[in-house]
Structures are given as C-alpha cells and as structure tokens.
Amino acid sequence: MKCNRCQNEDPKLFAYDHGVYYCRKCIDFSRLEVNEKIKPVKLMHKTWKGKPKLDYELTASQKLASHDVYKHLSNGKDVILYASTGAGKTEICFESICGYLAQGKKVGFAISRRQVVLEIATRLRKAFPELSICEVAQGYTQITDADIIVCTTHQLYRYPYAFDLLILDELDAFPFAGNEVLQAIANQACVGQKLMLSATPDEESMRFVEEKKTELVCLFERPHKHPLIVPKVIQVSVFLQVLIVIYECIKFCRDNKQTLVFVPRKRDGTWLKMILNLFVKTSLVHSSTENKDEILDCFRNKELDVLVCTTLLERGITIPSVQVVVFKGNHSVFTTASLIQIFGRVGRSFKDPKGEGICLCQFSNQSIKDCVYQISKMNDTVYAATKK
C-alpha cells in the first residue's frame, strides 16, 4: 500500500474502514483512500511579459545570482539559493518569476510561517502592481487563486500538480524542515522546478547539491554592502541578564531605536514584558497571541519601543534600525540556524546598515559558537580581500 499524497508505505499508518484502507499519516489534510487518485487543481494561467518595479537597482552580485538561478531553472534543475539574511533573496527570485510568467506558467511561493506569508505577499504586490497576488494562510482562505499564489507550506495541499515554479522560502524552518508529509505535499504541488531559499541550509539539502541533484547559488553580500552583524556574546547569570536587557532597551530607546528581545519560552516573555513596561513601551508576541498582526503593526509604526517575542519572529520580519537582544541564549530552542536568523534582523536598512546584536547566556554552547563562526565566515567570504 502507498498513499498517493504523502507517499506513506508504513502498514501501521493505514486504517481500514468500510472495506477500504486510508492513510492516517496525512489525515489532517483530509481523508485519502488507498488507490484514490488526486486530481490536478484547475488554476488560471496568465501570460505576462513585464518587469518588476523596485525601489533600488539590484547590485552586481544580486544580478549575477539572479541570472544564475534562472539559468539553472531554465535547464530543468532545482536550485538552492544559499543567501545571508538581508541579501535580498525575494528580489533575486523576480527574474525567474518573470521568466515563467512570460511563458504562461504558474508560479507559487510557499513559506512555513503565516506572518512571513503576509509580508512576502505585500512585497510582491509592490513589485508586481499589474498582477494579482493572493495569500493563503490561516484566516486568509477566501481567495485561493491569483497570478502569483503565496501560501504556507501547509496550504500546498490545495494545489496538487499546480506549479511550474514553486519557490520554497525558509527551507530549513519549522514546521517544514524534517516533516515528511509537508515535503511530499510540496513535491506533489510542483510539476516543474523548485527554487529553495535559505540562509541556513541543512545537511540533507547540501547533500543533494553534492550528489548533483540540485544546483547551488550563493550570495552573502547585502545590497548596502555592509558586513553582517556578528553578535556580542555576554556570559552572565540570569539575574544579570535581566538587568542588561533593561539597560540595553533603555539605551536603544534613547537613541530612537527599537528593540526585539527574543526569549526561549512564553513564560519568560510574560514576566520580562511586565518588567520592561516599567521603563519603555513594551509588548509581547508568541504563538498563542491572538492579535499578533495588530501588535506587529504597532511595532512597525513605532508605537512600541520594545517587542518581546519567541522564535516565532526569527524570520521574515524586517524593521528599520531594529536592535536585537537574545535572553537565555544557551536554551536549546535557540539552534544555530535560529540564532543566525535572529541576528539577521539587525542592519538590514540602507539608512541604518549597522546595529547591535547581543546574545545573553549563562554559558556559550555549540549553537552560539557555530552562529558566530558562520556569520563571521560569510563576512570573510565577501570582505576578506578588502581586509588585506
């Protein structure tokens, strides 16, 4: 037996009901019986031969990466775009998007997290004002077809055999990474090529590159040409960490800069927010927060000085002149990939390409050490020649 959706072949994950077997592994995406064929979804296909509208011209490095990506895709190869945070991964996809749309092909953009889906959709609307863009995620399922579809990886179950180009952002992010069901659904949604974006590709992805199954394009230079922010690691007790968080948030506020304070658990965020609110305007966002979008809008509009958050906001959110402090950085929830993404929030703006990233911890574990090493290595790859 084999499930035609998630490719499950484990007998223990099939159930028997009224004379038929069905798959329990992907039951969350509706019941699918064994031997039941999945029909291709019918979507609009528009031929569009236009160009994206950008606020700035791509750098020479971005143009080269963009060209290489489209060249590999045009040759029928899947591509991993390994680019540092803030390098402009989304914009580098635009040449490929235009190339596929010019041929009347269907383009989809899938991301693990709902917040990032909304942000990417906004950026695509700005770059492609002549095209219809729809976001498909929790709370946004009324419209499921447009010239370009942006959805969570969970929502890809709606699109079997749909996309000639499927762009998978945050390849290494929860819940997509390591999830066999979501990965199988993504593979089924793509009838052409996959363009996979990551600042922290995992070992399996890099193995596909070594085995020549996937092409690799790298870009570690940000458009403003300033180095990535290497975090300052401070090893102190939890009590002193709290005092440093308060001090740094007040200091940044006086400099008219906002702060993201990352905590490992909701309960850490709850009491830390209460303490910080005594000194600066502070709010809290985590997975159970009901009004996430409203709080994020307030932070973007500078109505808040500090936003305490869990790793929910480690990716996708872009705030000019934001500073980052990680509290209890040696907690297991802060993996190397997570920390690289978190400190990648700093220094993304052309107007303020510098900033501070501070990792507070009781001791520097391997994740912290690897984070510092990998960010430094990316900088060395780009700027080593200028240091000599």
Task: Label each PLM-derived region with a short phrase.
Residues 176-187, 191, 332-355:
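Conserved SF2 helicase motif VI
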Residues 54-77:
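N-terminal pre-P-loop "Q-motif" helix
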Residues 191-204, 345-374:
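Conserved segment of the helicase C-terminal RecA-like domain
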Residues 118, 131-143, 283-310:
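Conserved helicase ATPase core of P-loop NTP-dependent helicases/translocases
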Residues 163-169, 306, 317-330, 340, ...:
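A short beta-strand element within the Helicase C-terminal
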Residues 161-165, 170-235, 241-248:
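Post-DEXD/H (motif II) to motif III coupling segment of the RecA-like Helicase ATP-binding lobe
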Residues 82-90, 100-101, 105-120, 250-276:
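Conserved strand-helix element at the start of the C-terminal RecA-like helicase core
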Residues 1-45:
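Interdomain "pre-motor" coupling segment immediately N-terminal to P-loop NTPase/helicase cores
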